[in-house]
């Protein structure tokens, strides 16, 4: 009974003070009350981080809080470079498998090879290490050496490699290549500090090789720095063209224009987008569509039209707060509605509604209708960029079984073991990627090994869509093998493009004499209807 009255007394005291305490003081009193009275000991950092997270949950979905460590990792990712040794790897059963070596990087100079197995890093065995833990051990300060214990197939003894870390450029361009004698292709994965320079070099190189038309792939590009999006728009639009404008808290508008220093202001341009194309990618796509500069191919983009500004906190953490909404040159808002619990699941909602597979299921109210600035074509705002040419989603490609293979890296070990046994013979038969991509067929037994590994992991192959899934698995394996056999480019994506519906549709448009120009042609004005005079009866 006594305990009840103590609790009640505390509650009554709190209620009596409610009107006297301002909200900020209330927060501090709550923190102190937890510190002084809660049964378990809790650190201040954990409590404050939880309080901040609670406040951020009351804002829009894109305002976020980053701890000091998270902020540092984000800055490194966006800067486009880090100090490391220049390798790609996978971790499988206590072994680190080197899958790719960056040309000219520290690992390449030290003689590390694709196919090597890393057993220990600085005398520490990698047993039990996760991908993230391996990455933390390999990355470090520029100029600081790292010692790797390596097992190489064909060698009786393990070897030690001492490699000096150097800055590695984490390229925002996944790959750039000539599809044929006149069509170039560039896949952009992120908008970072290095994106404009990378794009400049890629365009100059492709033009020197005969490029007259370009496919710019922004599929699954989640955005990045807005300044980089302006820079890429500058590559394709003349000087003083509006890229976008933003409207902030005070309702004032800021306008962002091109500078006129682009490498590809003429020539056919097609942009590939999908349901995961977001943010800075949508700014760029919207500008190119509004100025009738490019044909947009694919599916409606994600719909993120909010601009975040970082607000540093003294301990190194960062609040990334939405400070403005951005609009395309024609005045379209790209942001989809974010009130409600379905925001993060919006892509799945669109899939369930049939919107991703049937263009007739896509509906925009007339209030969201707009027109492009040159040809006066009809476009829509209010929830992403709608493409000029719709390409339905291959639902088998997003089947849960294939997703499990990717998420759990089930294909990686069979592919690596296959290369271990066949690397020399493959390189003897296929001297370069072009011949490999043209003639190589993945053997059926390798596909079956992956199917068996998936079954053992609890992901059996279902009968529905089986043939298509096996075809996609074979293509995925071919891409993996290509990326490990040949260095210097992202050959994985080049292999996958041979069966990408949006890519193939873009090629078809570019091969038609008026394919692109026809879609970008000005809308013909309909003559006014004239009344026919007749005799009154």
Predicted regions and their residues:
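Bacterial Sec-dependent N-terminal signal peptides
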Residues: 1-23
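A sequence-level detector of short linear motifs
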Residues: 127, 160, 320, 335, ...
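Extended, small/polar residue-biased N-terminal targeting/export presequences
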Residues: 21, 38-99, 145-175, 496-507, ...
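Structured segments of extracytoplasmic/periplasmic soluble domains
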Residues: 33-37, 41, 50, 54-58, ...
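Polar, glycine-rich mid-to-C-terminal structural blocks
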Residues: 280, 292, 299, 303-367
């Amino acid at each position: 009974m006594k305990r009840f009255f103590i609790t009640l007394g505390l509650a009554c005291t709190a209620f009596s003070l409610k009107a006297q305490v301002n909200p900020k003081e209330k927060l501090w009193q709550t923190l102190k009350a937890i510190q002084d009275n809660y049964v378990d000991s809790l650190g201040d950092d954990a409590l404050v981080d939880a309080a901040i997270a609670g406040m951020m949950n009351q804002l829009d979905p894109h305002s976020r809080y980053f701890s000091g460590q998270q902020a540092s990792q984000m800055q490194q990712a966006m800067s486009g470079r880090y100090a490391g040794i220049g390798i790609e790897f996978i971790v499988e059963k206590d072994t680190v498998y080197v899958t790719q070596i960056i040309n000219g990087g520290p690992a390449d100079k030290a003689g590390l090879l694709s196919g090597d197995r890393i057993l220990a890093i600085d005398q520490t065995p990698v047993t039990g290490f996760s991908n993230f833990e391996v990455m933390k051990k390999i990355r470090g300060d520029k100029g600081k050496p790292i010692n790797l214990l390596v097992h190489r197939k064909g060698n009786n003894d393990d070897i030690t490699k001492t490699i000096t870390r150097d800055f590695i450029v984490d390229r925002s361009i996944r790959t750039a290549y000539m599809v044929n004698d006149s069509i170039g292709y560039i896949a952009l994965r992120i908008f970072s500090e290095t994106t404009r320079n990378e794009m400049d070099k890629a365009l100059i190189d492709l033009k020197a090789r005969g490029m007259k038309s370009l496919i710019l792939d922004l599929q699954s590009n989640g955005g990045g720095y807005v300044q980089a999006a302006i820079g890429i728009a500058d590559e394709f639009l003349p000087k003083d063209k509006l890229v976008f404008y933003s409207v902030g808290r005070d309702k004032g508008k800021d306008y962002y224009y091109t500078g006129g220093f682009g490498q590809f202001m003429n020539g056919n341009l097609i942009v590939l987008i999908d349901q995961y194309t977001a943010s800075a990618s949508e700014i760029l796509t919207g500008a190119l569509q509004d100025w009738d500069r490019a044909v947009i191919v694919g599916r409606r983009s994600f719909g993120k039209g909010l601009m975040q500004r970082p607000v540093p906190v003294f301990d190194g953490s960062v609040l990334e707060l939405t400070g403005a909404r951005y609009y395309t040159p024609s005045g379209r808002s790209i942001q989809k509605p974010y009130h409600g619990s379905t925001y993060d699941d919006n892509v799945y909602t669109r899939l369930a509604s049939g919107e991703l597979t049937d263009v007739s299921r896509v509906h925009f109210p007339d209030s969201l209708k707009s027109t492009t600035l040159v040809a006066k074509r009809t476009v829509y705002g209010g929830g992403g960029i709608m493409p000029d040419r719709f390409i339905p989603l291959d639902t088998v490609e997003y089947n849960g079984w294939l997703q499990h293979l990717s998420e759990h890296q089930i294909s990686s070990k069979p592919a690596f073991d296959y290369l271990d046994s066949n690397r020399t013979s493959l390189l003897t038969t296929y001297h370069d990627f072009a011949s490999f991509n043209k003639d190589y067929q993945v053997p059926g037994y390798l596909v079956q090994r992956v199917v068996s590994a998936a079954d053992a992991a609890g992901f059996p192959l279902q009968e529905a869509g089986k043939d298509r899934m096996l075809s996609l698995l074979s293509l995925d394996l071919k891409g993996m093998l290509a990326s490990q056999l040949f260095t210097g480019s992202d050959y994985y994506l080049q292999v996958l493009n041979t069966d990408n519906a949006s890519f193939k549709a873009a090629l078809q448009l570019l091969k038609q004499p008026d394919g692109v120009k026809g879609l970008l042609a000005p809308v013909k004005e309909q003559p006014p209807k004239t009344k026919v005079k007749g005799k009154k009866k």
